[in-house]
């Protein structure tokens, strides 16, 4: 079974130098930017709406990414939109949400329908960001339900850049190419 599968007339679209582990599943209306990495056990399902993942983002082991359909309660449904240089930690659930550039979603976190994580947003491990919530720029949210804990330091913001760059180098090792970084 191939990890990349069409759904109806939609086939996942892949940018350059993308790494997709053979033990994951990517279905339907999914677009991966250049240098994206998708690690073992991840499921990205773009069946009833679309998923977009920006350049240099990494989706770590066991993550589930899905979308919501249009309904009488939500006319358009919600896609899942992930910006550039985003780190999605192991075992995360992203459902019909928006993650802007240079964010980190901690291991085991859950971000639900219509929620938005602004640039440099950091969702701590195990946190649950409820439907429609907005994590502001450079904010750390923790807990279940997730709440604002504090603003990130400059050093923590630097670590978000580092995390994305590290995963580009790592996926290049898996692909057997030089990243030039």
Where do the PLM segments sit?
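Short proline/glycine- and basic residue-enriched helix-capping loop/turn segments at helix->loop/beta transitions
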Residues: 87
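N-terminal segments that cap or nucleate solenoid repeat domains
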Residues: 2-38
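Thr-Gly-centered strand-to-loop micro-motif
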Residues: 21, 46-47
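Glycine-rich hexapeptide-repeat left-handed beta-helix
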Residues: 1-13, 41, 47-80, 90-91, ...
């Amino acid at each position: 079974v191939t990890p990349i599968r069409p759904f109806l007339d939609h086939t996942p679209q892949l940018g350059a130098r993308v790494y997709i582990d053979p033990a994951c599943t990517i279905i339907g209306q999914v677009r991966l930017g250049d240098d994206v990495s998708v690690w073992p056990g991840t499921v990205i399902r773009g069946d009833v709406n679309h998923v977009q993942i920006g350049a240099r983002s990494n989706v770590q082991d066991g993550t589930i990414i899905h979308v919501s359909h249009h309904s009488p309660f939500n006319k358009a449904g919600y896609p899942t939109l992930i910006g550039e240089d985003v780190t999605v930690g192991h075992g995360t659930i992203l459902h019909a949400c928006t993650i802007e550039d240079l964010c980190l979603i901690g291991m085991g976190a859950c971000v639900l329908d219509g929620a938005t994580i602004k640039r440099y947003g950091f969702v701590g491990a195990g946190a649950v960001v409820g439907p429609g919530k907005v994590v502001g720029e450079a904010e750390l949210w923790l807990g279940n339900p997730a709440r604002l804990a504090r603003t990130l330091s400059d050093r923590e913001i630097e670590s978000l850049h580092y995390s994305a760059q590290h995963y580009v180098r790592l996926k290049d090792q898996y692909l057997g190419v030089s990243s030039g970084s």
